[in-house]
Amino acid sequence: MSEAEEIILCGIEHAELLAEMHSRSFAGAAWNAKDFLELLVQKTNKGFIYCNNRKPVGFIIWQEVVGEAEILTFCVDPDFRRLGYSTNIIAKLFEYLNQVSVNKMFLEVSEDNIIALSLYKAMGFVEIARRSKYYHKPDGSTVDAVIMSADI
């Protein structure tokens, strides 16, 4: 990690910032500050904000339970996409999880989120299941959720 990069552990004091960043990434489906507060008060949920030159560029929130973790939400600000931050954030999460003896990671992603699917596959995730018609789109259509896992 360069001197310009910094990891900040998420706390309840970051709920507004997380909600703002989430809304820029998930228009129409964003979580609000209350949602993040409810997540962050649970002991099994953790997260960090990835900053570059003191500017928050993305964050990831996950849940840890008995040697496994699940990504609950993850985003990179649209202004900072395609610059390698997504890969850096997941790599930092893997480093952390390895240190705390988590050996399996799970996530779910919309089957039409091709960029995210490509990233996750490149980071070692494989599809293990699907949830049929799980995500509802604004036009009324549905898409499957792809459940993926990776060994840490």
Locations of regions flagged by a protein language model:
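Short amphipathic helical patch at the helix-1/turn junction of helix-turn-helix
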Residues: V76, S110-E111
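Acetyl-CoA-dependent GNAT
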Residues: S2, L9-L83, I90-K92, Y96, ...
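Structural preference for beta-strand elements that scaffold enzyme active sites
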Residues: E68, K104-F106, I147
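Terminal substrate-recognition subdomain of acyl/acetyltransferases
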Residues: G140-I152
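Conserved catalytic-core motifs of GNAT/GCN5-like acyltransferases
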Residues: F106-E108, K121, V126-S141
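Short glycine/proline-centered loop/turn elements that form peptide/ligand docking sites
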Residues: S86, I90, N113-A116, K133-D139
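Short hydrophobic clusters on alpha-helical segments that form packing/core surfaces
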Residues: L93-L97, M105, A116
